[in-house]
Amino acid sequence: MVWQSLLDIDKQLLLALNGDGGAGWDTFFYIVSARLTWVPLYAAILYAVWKQWGWRRLLWVAVVLGLCVGAADQICNFFKHFTPKFRPTHTPDIEAFVHTVRGYRGGLYGTVSAHAAISFAIALFTARLFRKRWYTVAIFGWALLLAYSRIYLGVHYPRDILLGTALGLGLGAGAFALFGRLMKRVETPPERTENISSDK
């Protein structure tokens, strides 16, 4: 009974947040949700890493963050295949009431939102990396916007977004911890460099 009540609340929240905002908002959130839209942002982040720390750290950031994003995507796919749950656009009792944009309905299942997981993983990792308040606010604002776009388009329930967000934050934190350990191993501390030079 409790579980069914939670599912009903999830559906009610979805329908409340999925209202038709008109052609302008439809286009806006459709573009926001498209993965290719944010390629320039990812390129800008990598450029900022290179500008501040150089090629070596850029390579490690790209590798660790790439593994983090890949893990988020695969874990979400695992849940979609092994604990399948219909997307709102494919749920028989509410699909007729779900607002969709340009006929986009997504695949059948959407247990955990990969968009939310990936965006929040990137947000946490890069916020910890740059440690700038303005950047932290901006990148988490971007992640929230991207996550909400999935509800607006009707392809994820709020619960899917929350699960994806939790997964992304966990993976982002783990990836940054791994990155920190790697940097301690591969980068020689300045003090050690000075000692080596003075010994010659």
Model regions and ranges:
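N-terminal transmembrane-helix/juxtamembrane module of multi-pass inner/ER membrane proteins
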Residues: 1-41, 76-107, 200
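Membrane-helix interface segments
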Residues: 24-25, 54-60, 89, 131-137
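Hydrophobic core of alpha-helical transmembrane segments in multi-pass integral membrane proteins
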Residues: 40-49, 66-67, 170-174
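Hydrophobic, aromatic-rich transmembrane alpha-helices
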Residues: 41-52, 119-127
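Alpha-helical membrane-inserting segments
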Residues: 45, 71-75, 79, 171-179
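Interfacial segments of alpha-helical transmembrane regions
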Residues: 46-75, 136
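Membrane helix-loop-helix hairpins that form the core translocation module of multi-pass transporters
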Residues: 58, 66, 70-86, 162, ...
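Membrane-embedded catalytic cores of phosphoryl/pyrophosphoryl-handling enzymes
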Residues: 99-200
